[in-house]
């Protein structure tokens, strides 16, 4: 038993999106009921009417549309919530019961996503400061240590205690002015004796009392009221109410289950966890701990420790939002109770679902944590669902977050990945859950460890999950320490973590050992082989770039993987997995049917989206295979069956591959032969030189599906029409349209082609004078519509794969004012080309600079050309040596025809084991194939390579290997852009920016300096006027260019006039003057009218260059 375990030290991975699912399940089973019950009963202001929600009996009705249908119709996949409510009239004793509709609740799909208005969205997990009490020490300006304690609730007022240099204890309520701590304690009704009995060092608190003098309870309450409500006459009753509502009213103040747990743990109290408000005992204990700190008893807290930060997942975020909605609902119900007649009231007339619906809609539609799902490939989808963000409501902001929050903390070990985080302003604020981490009932992150007894790892015992707090006082060894077959730790010294420090100890001292070497990193990072040989910065880029890999036409799994590819693909939900044992009875491109055999697991009795399940033997299960769906990122989602008719399948077997998967394993890129060598400067600065084979054989070809949409609206002048009759368009442009004016499926379209013909009625004002004259004379309506068709934008082309028509008659829900919506999907095959971005898994990214014919590529001794040439200088300074190991082991695998799975951190099998295994496999490849050139032990990893153009060998042997390279989603087709004329900004009249706006290239401040430095005055002048915002000048210039005349002299830029107007609007009399020389030789100061260019501009006094003709040139000679 143990020896088997030794061969397989890897611990089984948990379900990777369980964090989303279990959280939403908690919301449905507990969270929602908890909220409904906390608002029940609602009484009116007189107290004679009561409305009770019977929360635990709430019902969800069947969703209106299925997941697929909701996506197609642009609607939300949601269920209706009904709650039984009871209206009690205390005067008459009437009881009315009714089931009341309280709103739509979006449902989570089985893949952990939500479908909101037809788009798949993900709710990101938020990591926030846990409620509880925190102690911190500060050094004041005199160099004396002072301590402070903050009591932070889940919701409600903060309470902060602090000591000062005179040894007095102060308290602040909700960040207001300082108040003596004695006032608060006395106001709570505690006597001096009670206070002193609770303190370990009462003599310290005595100073505060001596300084302030004694307070009675009444005086204390008055003082409290004065401080919190300055300017109002203080009363004892007012003070009492103020205190009660601030800290002891469960509606206003809530520690939450977590807050109570943390408080009890820190202050060693035993208050039951149903008490969610403060007690006087809590406050006393907090003050006691604070005073003890002055005597060096106790410890201060580290805010960034994961024991003090907790995760709020979907369920809790949604619960908070429901609370907001119910708060608004409660107010409305109260008002209606007061206003309406008590006899005719029914629960249904009282409860208005709108506020709750609005709150939920707002959360899913516009919360910072509800994000459009990143669907580029399965890994991106998986990572997005496991993301942890410190931003969002109740979290941090980018500007406020310092370095400490962003930093890697020792408690992140096995909980948050230290590597995967964005580059840029969000670095460290957005992280990713580590592979084995899970969230416990309080929202703290836990990670599993194996127990160790007397230096022997107990593989026979279940792994223990521990939070960061529990793990602090234990000696924990990492997952890659060597053990023998009996589980004994090998070696005299073992590296361990103990109380946030990394140190070494003897094997006997170790308490626990991590379950797996990849436990500390996230899913994306654990897909990088030889991760331990890469610099962390490059591993970060590698993790982030794998998520940007485009799904290719023919996916190919890596020759060198890490063993997590299969689980990653399965949990992303992209592959179809058999739910039972059985026989395949039918397979085609769109469905797979399996006849069940054997016993069904009891849990699968529930029906899910994909095929209905009931546990009868011999029953068939249908699995739908999706074909060529468009993803959120315009990539193509396509599944293809892997099984044949008549095949036996077992539960959990992969039935169909999704995009970017092959054989049920993640396959983001392609294995290609790489040479590390410079080639004519084409791989300078990370550029990449590739072979034409990658283009011809469609190795890096991907399919992209673009969606174009147009709606025919109701306008003031009449409805817009979707039609084939478009004014001023020849029959040639219409040949692909059907009789309705919509493009037919299968048509090839290019930029500027009409996809949907649409005409808009135009009013009188839109017509030129000659048109008006004609209509006045002949009284005929020269067809008064203008062409408003949907055309293919610039730079796009492809084949129409789908057309969808939505009209009111068919019962589709359309946006207000629209009569009809047409959606056209255009697919394009994009081969790899110059300007596309490629990357490996080790952060080695580059842009393709040239595509060489196959015959010109450097070739190997057996005549086979390499596929890609990378710059060797990209390796040493970046310290991502993992790519070299990967490409050499890949070369061995390529030669032997095998694939390798290498778990990261393989040094547990001995020193330099990565190098040993690579050399060993290369040697094996050479011996098995009998080709001596494959591996030369004297110059390991290098091979003599020949120049494809001349056939000469290159000067030196070159590192050759097979690397796994990805094509990233940053494609040149989406970025390349040019503008001749186009739209201008309204105020400044300068061209807009960006490809989407058909914008121009910004000629910024520094570029202006460059031209100034060269004295290129005329070039600069036309850049700042004619080419930008001199309105009249640019029209004249265009006219001149068209007619072949000289370009006239530029006028005044519009932005200068805007500046003038702005200064004038401040009341400054500012004007432009110029000096004119008069006929008699005297000069005169003339004000320039900047609005004069509305009149015809006078031609400038300057030599005009008529366009030179050939004759005049001949004359000169």
From Swiss-Prot:
It catalyses: RNA(n) + a ribonucleoside 5'-triphosphate = RNA(n+1) + diphosphate. Residues 1094-1117 are annotated as: Disordered. It is an enzyme of class 2 (transferase). GO terms for cellular component: DNA-directed RNA polymerase complex. Keywords: DNA-directed RNA polymerase, Nucleotidyltransferase, Transcription, Transferase. One of its GO terms (biological process) is DNA-templated transcription. It comes from the Bacteria. The keyword Lyase does not apply. GO terms for molecular function: DNA binding; DNA-directed RNA polymerase activity; ribonucleoside binding. Its EC number is 2.7.7.6. The keyword Transport does not apply. Residues 1108-1117 have a biased composition (Basic and acidic residues). HAMAP family: RNApol_bact_RpoB. Belongs to the RNA polymerase beta chain family. DNA-dependent RNA polymerase catalyzes the transcription of DNA into RNA using the four ribonucleoside triphosphates as substrates. In cyanobacteria the RNAP catalytic core is composed of 2 alpha, 1 beta, 1 beta', 1 gamma and 1 omega subunit. When a sigma factor is associated with the core the holoenzyme is formed, which can initiate transcription. This is DNA-directed RNA polymerase subunit beta. It comes from Trichormus variabilis (strain ATCC 29413 / PCC 7937) (Anabaena variabilis).
